[in-house]
Amino acid sequence: ALTTGWSRDDRDNLLVPTRGRYQRAFSEVGLPGLDLQYYRLNYQFQQFFPLFPRVTLAFNGEIGYGDGYSGDPYPFFKNYYVGGIGSVRGFETGSLGPRDVDDSPLGGNRRLNFSLEAYVPIPGADRTLRALTFVDAGQVWGLAPARDENGNFVIANGRPVYEDQRTDLGDLRYSVGIGVAWISPLGPLKLSYAYPLNRESQDRIQRFQFQIGTGF
């Protein structure tokens, strides 16, 4: 596959930014003549604002889209996954979106997620240890097992039939929460507690989550 990328970083600090913008775009294409002919397009946007003298407001948004071409299907192992730290906290990592007949997450070829966070330094600590509050939203769409009018899976030739989901912003999952972020000697650490706002019966919930690495 051919991959290309572009990024621009205007943040005032790479580890503890208080103002500025970060953008990243990425593409991946399975070239004609190869076994898999597909493409993936990704874009990430971050903006940081000094809300008050010691409070920073941060926005992160990500969008991704992939598909096959020349009659080839989009490879399932290139699917996007949403849920957990880095997308929608309060839900299990990678658990949102379509589920297979065995209830395992399938991911999808379309993703959208965004977060709004407010950071404030913890009193008595340096600026690398901060408390935060956040709002997350996101979802992933793709192929899902088809169901009949009774809600049963459609089976043909002994195998489930899959149909492409419609991209519906009404499917977005939302959560709010609090957490702590620390730029440790091992790298960025983040601990969060989230409350899902519009969980469905099939959603997998994980309120406490921990992450090492990546700022958002």
Question: Where are each of the predicted segments found?
Answer:
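Short amphipathic alpha-helical interaction segments
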Residues: 104, 108, 164, 168-172, ...
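C-terminal outer-membrane beta-barrel translocator/porin domains of Gram-negative envelope proteins
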Residues: 1-129, 133-162, 202, 210-215
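Short glycine-rich, acidic/polar surface loops and turns
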Residues: 117-119, 167, 173-181
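Glycine-centered small-residue hotspots that permit tight backbone geometry or close packing
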Residues: 84, 90, 159, 173-179, ...
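Outer-membrane beta-barrel "beta-signal"
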Residues: 3, 180-189, 205-216
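Exposed loop/turn and edge beta-strand positions of beta-sandwich/beta-sheet ligand-binding modules
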Residues: 39, 174, 206
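A short, acidic, flexible beta-alpha connecting loop/helix-capping segment that sits on the rim
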Residues: 195-199
